[in-house]
Regions:
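Structured C-terminal cap/extension of enzyme domains
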Residues: 30-34, 53, 224-316
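C-terminal segment of N-terminal export signals and the immediately downstream linker at the start
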Residues: 35-67, 72-77
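Conserved, mostly hydrophobic/aromatic
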Residues: 53, 65, 98, 111, ...
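Active-site mouth loops of central-metabolism enzymes
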Residues: 68-80, 130-136, 262
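Glycine/proline-rich, positively charged
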Residues: 74, 133-220, 224, 230-237, ...
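Glycine-rich, proline-tolerant flexible connector loops at the mouths of alpha/beta enzymes
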Residues: 99-114
């Protein structure tokens, strides 16, 4: 058995990690470039699409990731290792925004395990979680628990989950932000619930982010909430962009239209995601997956062109 000098092992390990990151990005770019049969790939170098957070100007990639159900795997060692590789792929392909919640079972603990194993590879991380309890003091404890589970000193974003006890929790989060213990404050809803109340909060409260449900078969938020976010300078995170997988059940039996090449789309996942993030009010979408191949498809939506308003109408 041949022993290698430790410096050579370290150099080789660093090279392999860098090669993996480069390879995954090239896979995404190749999927984009494949939609241009007459364009040489060597000349086609699309950039990762980013959008600014209106309150700060910080730019985020338009494709993030959620963890609902997919990271709720408890202490299963093999499942935890799998999720670590899913998260590694996300970062290797340029992802930053990772969203979770105490509501998601063991997801936050599993995320902490994955982030710890990845070390510097889990960077840059834009950490987003939520506070979800009807009691104000319990909410403060929950925030501290989430930081411990993730292994972080502070979060990039904390959000009041589904408007539960939103007045008190919003006070807590805004004070944390004022004290320098939190970068951004947000509020969330899902399934199209409580939109009127959410609209009033967006009108009256100094929030940085709003999170809501939006996909190609549910465009209700285009009427009032998305225009309001643009008007008020509020960043928008989109949850359930695949309608919990329902869009695949409906569309995947059909071939992807040839005209999707016009906005660099290679599969149905990218079709659904590019529709969502092409809306000018949307900052980021957070699809969830437990599979590396699906993560590669999802992240590919963050490269190349996006559909314009005319193409969006054709997609519907």
């Amino acid at each position: 058995m041949v022993s290698l000098p430790i410096t050579m092992v370290i150099n080789m390990t660093g090279y392999l990690l860098q090669s993996r990151r480069t390879l995954l990005k090239q896979l995404a770019l190749m999927s984009v470039a494949s939609t241009f049969p007459y364009t040489a790939f060597s000349k086609f170098k699309p950039a990762l699409i980013t959008r600014p957070i209106p309150s700060s100007g910080q730019r985020l990639p338009v494709i993030g990731m959620g963890t609902h159900i997919t990271f709720n795997v408890g202490n299963d060692p093999q499942a935890r290792l799998n999720r670590t590789e899913v998260l590694r792929t996300f970062f290797d392909m340029g992802g930053q925004v990772v969203d979770s919640s105490p509501m998601y079972g063991s997801a936050e603990a599993v995320l902490g395990f994955c982030i710890n194993r990845l070390g510097k590879s889990a960077s840059p991380l834009f950490s987003a979680t939520k506070v979800w309890t009807s009691d104000t003091e319990d909410g403060k404890e929950q925030i501290a628990d989430s930081q411990r589970l993730w292994g972080l000193d502070q979060f990039s974003l904390n959000q009041v989950h589904n408007l539960v006890n939103w007045r008190s929790h919003l006070d807590t989060l805004l004070q944390m932000k004022a004290d320098g213990h939190l970068q951004y404050v947000g509020i969330t809803t899902s399934h199209g619930r409580r939109h009127r109340e959410l609209e009033k909060i967006m009108q009256s409260q100094p929030i940085d982010f709003v999170q809501l449900t939006y996909h190609i078969n549910n465009q209700d938020v285009e009427q009032r909430l998305l225009p309001l976010a643009l008007e008020k300078g509020i960043a928008v995170i989109i949850n359930r962009p695949f309608s919990k997988g329902g869009l695949f059940d409906e569309y995947q039996r059909y071939p992807l239209p040839d005209w999707t090449m016009e906005f660099d789309c290679s599969n149905w996942a990218q079709f659904f995601l590019k529709f969502v993030v092409s809306h000018p009010a949307v900052t980021c979408a957070i699809p969830a997956t437990s599979r590396i191949d699906h993560m590669i498809e999802n992240m590919g939506a963050g490269y190349g062109r996006l559909p314009d308003s005319g193409m969006r109408q054709r997609m519907i």
